[in-house]
C-alpha cells in the first residue's frame, strides 16, 4: 500500500494549489491561469519526483525522440488513465499543452478541473451532438494555433480496458487537423493501465513506471484519406512500441 510519507507529501503538494484554484477561478480568471500554470510547470514534475523518491516509481520520458519534433505540432496518443494528462505535461513541460477531453474532467477533480477550465482545454460534453462536438474541436484548434499551443487528442476516445490499443476514431482528429494544419506527432505511453482506478493506483504504485515516447512525425494531412492513413499507421506503431516495452522491468529504460 502507499506509504504514509508518500501520501502526506502528495496531499501537502496538492491541497494549497487545489484550494487556491477553486477559490480563484470564479473571481479572477487571470489568477486561476497563473495557479494552473504553476500546477503544470512545477507540480506535475514534483508529483513524479515524490513517487520516485518514496515509491521507486520511475518516469521514463524518452527525450531523444523529441529531437524530431517541429516547433508546432499535434499529438495523437493511446490512452490508459487519467494520469496520462500529468504525464504529457511533464514530458512536454517546455511546451503549452492542451487536451481534447470529456467535460467530466472539468468538474470535481482536485487540482485538475479548474486547471483544465482556466487554461481553456477542449472539454466536450458527453451528450454533445456530433456537430456540436466538432464545433468545440474546431474552435479549440484555431485557438491552439493562435496561441502556439500543442493540442493533444486520444483517438480511442476512452481509456483502454485491457491494456491494448483500441480502435482509433477519425472524426475528431480530422476536424482538429482541418482547423490547425499542424504536423502530427505519434506518441506512445505505457504504465497507466495498471493505475487506471484509485484502488489499482494505490496497489500498483510501488516500483511501477510510466513510459512516453515520440514514435513518428507526419506532415500535415491534406485529405480524409491521409488522416485515416495516419491513424491506421499510428495505432500499429503504438501497439508495437507497447509490445517492445512489455518485457522491461520498471527500472529498465
Question: PLM features: what roles do these ranges have?
Answer:
Residues 1-42, 65-69, 143, 192, ...:
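Membrane-interfacial terminal anchoring regions of lipid-handling membrane enzymes
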Residues 111-113, 150, 161-225:
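A cross-family acyltransferase "interaction/gating" segment
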